[in-house]
């Protein structure tokens, strides 16, 4: 039935094109035809990159004065008849593709103004997007952020860079310095016209939090409507990440969430309380989060580990102590780093994953005290084991940290603009990378992609972002036994300061990369 309605709509469009503003009395000659050549039945194109350039050959068995029209309409639209959008009124077409990734129909109409006879040709346009595979780099100029996309058509090695792809699509940049990138496959939105799951890149800056459709790279929500209750001021620390039962946003050190099992429209709820008294709190700008469990968070105000039990409710809870452990509350510590290491499945009677991670902590009353804390999370229970960091260690004066996801028991860190690793089993430290003069390290991260279904794309890379007077570089290293290879696998380069990187492909989901 919908097909019949749709064909009727197209027929009416053609009829209107033939007859609108045309009061002449035409004599239609028998057997008139207009022949259109040079247009294929199907074209496959990349949105925001390709131009469709066609030069059809038009001929007729009648003397004619021709006028032309190109139109495009969307297929498989439920509940409404989609109008034909005119994109040109010339014989030759030169059209930059901006449509969303899906099937469209291109209509070419030729009208003989002398007789009123009209011929049209339909062509299927299969619009794809390059946004769904590649390296996304979140960068800024000190006050405004944007995204660069590095295309990888055959392997993780980049072959082309698209500068400022976010602002190219949306016509504006994102306010604030970049802080974090994450990805949801089931973010709820109405960007397709009906509420449903949306593959969304989550972009966090010091002044904005946005959900962006990875299909079109168009903004779904930003700080004006991504929180319930209307526009909300965003400030550091600001991050969006995933847990086992909810999506989370930290804004100005306060926690918001979207419970995964709730009916929602992609908006984070009100600020969560930390206790029944609604005591003030300030979450550390670091966390251990994955799809295996509720996140491990740390409140620097009360010096306590906290989480949101089962991703639901309006109040965080303290972890129950899983002895033997150091105290988990009122620790007289600030968290400098908390990160995910691995998840281990526990069989009967637990039937759940234990998440293991590490944290770096500094004393409050004695700032010279620093320690490594090994964390073992069994649902709402937490066991924490502490080891003092000696002041002679390079790790003692580290400024940035990154754990290896499930690989060697190594903690990577930055000291004096150099990348080192620290063996968590024996405390051995080793220099790994010194950037060239004039380059300053802006972030480090381990990214491992092992999806067998994505033939040719799996990788295991340690990433180092740097900035210089001329722009940014992102060094990508393979490694062996926890040590970086001397020569980078590849180096991505662009303008501005790189703050974060994320790999996107059709097979990437929330659980592909831990949210460190």
Predicted segments with their positions:
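Positively charged n-region of N-terminal signal peptides that target proteins for export
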Residues: 1-7
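Intrinsically disordered, low-complexity segments enriched in Gly and acidic/Ser/Thr residues
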Residues: 365-474
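Preference for solvent-exposed, low-hydrophobicity sequence contexts
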Residues: 163-169, 181, 185-402, 406, ...
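Repeat-based blade/solenoid architectures
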Residues: 173-179, 333-334, 338-340, 391-396, ...
């Amino acid at each position: 039935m919908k097909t019949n309605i749709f064909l009727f709509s197209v027929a009416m469009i053609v009829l209107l094109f033939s007859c609108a503003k045309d009061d002449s009395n035409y004599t239609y000659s028998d057997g008139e035809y207009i022949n259109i050549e040079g247009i294929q039945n199907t074209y496959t194109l990349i949105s925001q990159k390709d131009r469709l350039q066609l030069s059809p050959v038009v001929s007729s068995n009648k003397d004619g004065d021709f006028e032309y029209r190109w139109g495009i309409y969307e297929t498989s639209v439920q509940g409404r008849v989609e109008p034909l959008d005119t994109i040109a009124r010339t014989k030759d077409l030169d059209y930059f593709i901006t449509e969303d990734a899906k099937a469209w129909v291109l209509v070419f109409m030729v009208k003989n103004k002398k007789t009123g006879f009209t011929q049209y040709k339909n062509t299927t346009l299969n619009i794809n997007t390059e946004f769904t595979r590649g390296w996304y780099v979140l960068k800024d100029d000190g006050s405004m952020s944007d995204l660069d996309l590095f295309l990888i058509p055959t392997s993780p090695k980049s072959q082309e860079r698209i500068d400022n792809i976010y602002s190219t699509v949306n016509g504006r940049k994102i306010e604030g310095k970049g802080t974090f990138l994450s990805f949801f496959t089931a973010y709820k939105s109405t960007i397709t016209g009906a509420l449903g799951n949306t593959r969304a890149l989550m972009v966090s800056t010091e002044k904005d939090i946005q959900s962006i459709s990875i299909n079109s790279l168009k903004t779904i929500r930003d700080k004006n409507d991504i929180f319930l209750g209307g526009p909300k001021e965003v400030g550091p620390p600001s991050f969006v990440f995933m847990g086992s039962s909810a999506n989370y946003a930290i804004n100005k050190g306060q926690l918001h969430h979207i419970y995964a099992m709730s009916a929602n429209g992609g908006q984070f709820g009100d600020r969560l309380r930390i206790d029944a008294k609604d005591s003030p709190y300030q979450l550390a700008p670091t966390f251990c989060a994955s799809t295996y469990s509720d996140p491990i968070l740390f409140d620097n105000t009360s010096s306590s580990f906290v989480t949101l039990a089962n991703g639901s409710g309006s109040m965080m809870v303290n972890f129950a102590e899983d002895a033997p452990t150091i105290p988990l509350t009122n620790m007289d510590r600030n968290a400098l780093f908390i990160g995910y290491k691995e998840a281990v499945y526990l069989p009967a009677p637990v039937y759940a994953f234990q998440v293991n991670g590490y944290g770096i902590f500094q004393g409050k009353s004695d700032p010279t005290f620093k320690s490594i804390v090994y964390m073992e999370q069994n649902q709402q229970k937490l066991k924490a084991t502490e080891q003092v960091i000696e002041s002679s260690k390079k790790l003692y004066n580290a400024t940035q940290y990154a754990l290896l996801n499930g690989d060697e028991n190594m903690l990577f860190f930055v000291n004096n603009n150099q990348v080192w690793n620290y063996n968590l089993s024996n405390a051995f430290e080793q220099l790994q990378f010194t950037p060239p003069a004039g380059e300053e390290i802006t972030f480090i991260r381990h990214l491992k992609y092992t999806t067998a279904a994505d033939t040719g794309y799996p990788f295991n890379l340690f990433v180092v972002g740097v900035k210089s007077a001329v722009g940014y570089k992102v060094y990508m290293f393979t490694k062996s036994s926890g040590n970086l290879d001397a020569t980078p696998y590849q180096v991505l380069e662009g303008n501005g300061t790189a703050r974060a990187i994320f790999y996107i492909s059709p097979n990437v989901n929330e659980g592909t990369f831990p949210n460190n």
